A protein has these predicted regions:
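A short glycine-rich, Lys/Arg-flanked "PGG" loop and its adjoining helix->strand segment in the class I
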Residues: 145-160
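Class I SAM-dependent methyltransferase SAM/SAH-binding core
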Residues: 55-114
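A short SAM/SAH-binding and catalytic strip from SAM-dependent methyltransferases
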Residues: 129-145
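A short acidic, Gly/Pro-enriched loop at the edge of an enzyme's catalytic core
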Residues: 112-131
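Conserved class I S-adenosyl-L-methionine
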Residues: 1-52, 65, 69, 160-197
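Short alpha-helix
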Residues: 199, 209-233
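Core SAM-dependent methyltransferase catalytic element
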Residues: 226-228, 253-276
Length: 276
């Protein structure tokens, strides 16, 4: 990962800037969250199922709303994120709400070697029951083989990995979904200057960001290589979030690309089990 350290540093700076905007945005609606609202969506709640009494490692957790929502569902949670501003905010909210989640500021690629998981009983020795990640995650990672290795390492045998994220086809398109702009396959780093953020496109921030596209074959082969047997795979024509341009909301509350009549997938989910 040494070749990507400058990329990771740029992305960390960007997410620190984003966090300052996101925490006060209507998109995240932190006030409602503090007043008992869950940030989780129907998809992950139904597909992952009951987490009560289970240990859960949340990779790329941002400022931890989903981590804490899983804690409210009865899981013992650890959230990890690259942004120190996001993790500091997560710790503050967690303490304010008197929840039991733990938060670590780290690049997920460092977790295995740096042993940064808190030494809570059973975590290091037996692994986690669940590793969870969702919505805008793996595009920030250059190496999915290493990613899957980390997931497998921290799962106990029989443990579940779950991801809900935006569809690889979506990342091929320009911002208005009018033309193909990027490669479907992970051919090279995508480096761009970004203005604003998805919660407020007019926010007065600019950042250099580095992303990587990943095909389904890359995702699936990485999981299978590291002993993660895929048990469920779903694709969806909608997004639960209004986080892209040119979307419209349906009667079901979900967001779809205007004018495409659900011709294009917008997200997917995978559940895999670590083989004994």
């Amino acid at each position: 990962m040494e070749n990507y350290q400058s990329h990771f540093e740029d992305n960390k700076k960007s997410w620190n800037k984003r966090t300052a905007i996101h925490k006060d945005s209507a998109f995240y609606d932190l006030a409602s969250f503090k007043n008992s609202k869950s940030s989780l969506n129907k998809i992950e709640l139904e597909e992952l199922g009951d987490v009560k009494g289970k240990t859960l490692l949340h990779l790329q957790c941002h400022f931890g709303m989903d981590t804490m929502s899983w804690a409210k569902e009865g899981a013992t949670c650890v959230g990890v994120d690259l942004s120190d501003e996001a993790i500091n905010l997560a710790k503050t909210i967690n303490a304010e709400l008197k929840l039991n989640a733990e938060f670590i500021c780290a690049n997920i690629y460092d977790l295995k070697d740096a042993s940064k998981i808190p030494p809570k009983e059973g975590f290091r020795e037996a692994g986690f029951d669940i590793v969870f990640t969702s919505y805008g995650t793996i595009g920030w990672l250059p190496d999915l083989d290493k990613w899957a290795e980390i997931i497998s390492h921290f799962l106990k045998p029989g443990g579940i990995f779950y991801i809900a994220d935006f569809h690889p086809a979506l990342w091929m398109m320009d911002e208005d979904f009018e033309r193909i702009k990027y490669h479907y396959f992970n051919t090279e780093v995508i480096t761009e200057e970004i203005s604003g953020t998805y919660s407020d496109r007019d926010a007065p921030i600019k950042s250099i960001e580095h992303c990587w596209n990943h095909s389904f074959s890359e995702i699936i082969k990485a999981l299978l290589k590291h002993n993660l047997q895929i048990e469920m795979f779903n694709e969806f024509s909608f997004s639960p979030y209004n986080c892209f341009r040119n979307l419209e909301q349906g009667a079901d509350g979900m967001w779809r690309i205007k004018g495409l009549d659900e011709k294009m997938p917008m997200m997917y989910s995978i559940k895999a089990v670590k083989q004994v």
